[in-house]
Amino acid sequence: TFWGTEIPWVSISDMPISGYVTNTRESISKLALKSKKIDISPKGTLLMSFKLSIGKVAILDIPATHNEAIISIFPYANKENIIRDYLMIFLPLISTLGDSKDAIKGKTLNSTSISELLIPISNHEEMKRIISKVDLLFQKVSQLFE
C-alpha cells in the first residue's frame, strides 16, 4: 500500500511557520517510494508550498518525502547555509508576486512562474547580516508573546 510507517511524508500542515519539520502526521511505505518514483529530500532541505498556501517555507530536520503542493529547494550549498536561510526569509515575501493561477481549492504557482521569481541577492556578508537581523527581530516578537 501507499501509506505506511517507514518514510515521513510532509504535507503543508506539517510545516511550522518559518521553522523546522521534525515529524509528520503521515508516512509512506517503501513500496510507494519505488512504485511512484518519489524522491527522499535530505535533512536540511528548504521546502516551499506553491499550492493553496503559497510561500509557506520550512526546513527539513529529517529526511522525508512531500506531497505535490510542496517543492524541495536546493540552493548552492555552503557550510553555513547562508543562501538557504536567506531564501527562507525572502521566499514567503516574494512568492506572492509570481503569476498564480486560480484553482478549485485556491491559488497555485506553476514551475515557470516559480523559476521566474526575482530574488534580491547580495554578497554573503550582507546576507548573513540580514539573516541575523531578521532572527533577532523574530526573537523579540516571540518574547512579546511569552
Language-model segments: which ranges?
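A generic structural signal for residues embedded in beta-strands
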Residues: 48-49
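Generic short alpha-helical hydrophobic face used as a protein-protein interaction/packing hotspot
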Residues: 14, 91, 131-135
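Short, well-ordered loop/turn elements at secondary-structure boundaries
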Residues: 3-6, 40-44
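Short, charged beta-turn/beta-strand-edge "cap" motif at the junction between a beta-strand
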Residues: 53-56
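DNA target-recognition patches
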Residues: 1-32
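Amphipathic alpha-helical segments with low aromatic content
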Residues: 116, 123-146
